[in-house]
């Protein structure tokens, strides 16, 4: 019977302690200390949520009369006791001696006496997180007799000193979000089974860490020291580490050899420190032969560091002061797939034409929010996602994208691109392009030569006054078209403007100067955004060509009572949303003669300029 009960016991433990487990090697629990990541990073970056060893989806019910159980707690015959969140102010004194897994989280405990724990010699998991425990209230000998303890959770308390001694059987320890200033040699030392240690969000400085903090604990795989006051990388780190978090500290340099023994390290987080070019040398990262994820964002670097490991897949360098990418610093990293260089001080001349040569796996490049005055030459040939928004680019040349055949998403928004400076053949090679964003530029007309295979086209907040005949010709695969915030008038949108858009599902012409619902819209259209225009009427035939509409947005126009013909919507069998808020406040909707004449003159002037 003992063997048959072992699995149910394992399947009960710790679900009551905090929820689902994340895929880390050493199951632990604590606070999240991980930044918000883009979807592409999730393949390489596991969250810092310290998961518990989740072993069941059911909480233990209060045990039968034969099982002793403290008041308001839930107990099981297998030794699982849950006293979490019941406003305890004292350690429960009537715990069953066979307790294996004890949860006291989310209470008001301020102290624990050693004798209260000493009789629980079978205890394997102790969850004390989110209480009011102080170092004075947790004596050094508190855990002395817990020789079977594997998992200890003390996050979110008021500890200033770590316990001098912790049991040697520990697998995972969480001290996150305390006020720790001191770690002792045997706090984490001499624990061969220890796999994960969480110390983020404390007040640890270099002097508070012993030189041999993990002596005899060489199997630690996860170490989280983020958000402390460290100026140096801790010495003698465990060689088994595969995840090391040192972000949000005060690191200015990394001494030679700091990472030389960490050949198993896969993820290294160094963002939000004070690292400079001088603080890194050519060998800082060279021995990290397994490193796939490196985050150096939000430091003080002025160039891409040399000597980066060849194994890197994702490299964060954003939010520095980088002005140059030299010819040979990235080219050895043949596994690189994601390069994030946004929010730096890069100009096109600072990026060497050979900077990306040979990087055949590099498919995502972020260069936005820099000082690029043109598209850099020598872009990675296999790039699929290229973000160059928020720069100072004034034009697109014929050869700028001549070698990026695999490009699928191109964002050039919020630059200074004008229509005369955009070459008609600039996109001729982009036959795989699916998304093109030209919003926030200075375009007066839609660029000629738009890729025919684009699914999403954004030209919001430009200076478009008209859609030239044939501007959207051949774009049968276009699904979404955004023309928000331009100067488009109804006279400039003839029924032939949309004739080739057989697949269009979403059209956004909000924030223009339309006075009527556009004619000749494609039957495929499902969502039509017309808010913030000057539309004064909806006639009966307004939507005759668009029977598949699901959403019509007409808020904040000049519709008046009686100017909307109800029958206009009767044939729209799929209509789910009709938004006409912010209308019906203009009397009968008629304009005075002066206003009409003024608008006609403006239209004539703009049409003349366009010609």
Swiss-Prot record:
The keyword Repeat applies. GO terms for cellular component: cytoplasm; extracellular space. Pfam families: LRR_8 (PF13855). InterPro entries: Leu-rich_rpt, Leu-rich_rpt_typical-subtyp, LRR_dom_sf, LRRNT, SLRP. Kidney. Expressed in podocytes and likely vascular endothelial cells within the glomerulus. Residues 60-97 form the LRRNT domain. LRR repeats lie at residues 98-119, 122-145, 148-169, 170-190, 193-213, 219-239, 240-261, 264-284, 290-311, 312-332, 335-358, 361-382, 383-403, 406-427, 432-453, 477-490, 503-523, 524-545, 548-569, 574-583. The keyword Cell inner membrane does not apply. Residues 1-23 form the signal peptide. One of its GO terms (biological process) is negative regulation of cell migration. Belongs to the small leucine-rich proteoglycan (SLRP) family. SLRP class V subfamily. Binds to type I collagen. Gene3D superfamilies: Ribonuclease Inhibitor. Residues 594-611 have a biased composition (Acidic residues). Keywords: Extracellular matrix, Glycoprotein, Leucine-rich repeat, Repeat, Secreted, Signal. Glycans are attached at residues 215, 282, 411. Residues 585-611 are annotated as: Disordered. N-glycosylated. Negatively regulates cell proliferation and cell migration, especially in smooth muscle cells. It is found in: Secreted, Extracellular space, Extracellular matrix. GO terms for molecular function: collagen binding. This is Podocan.
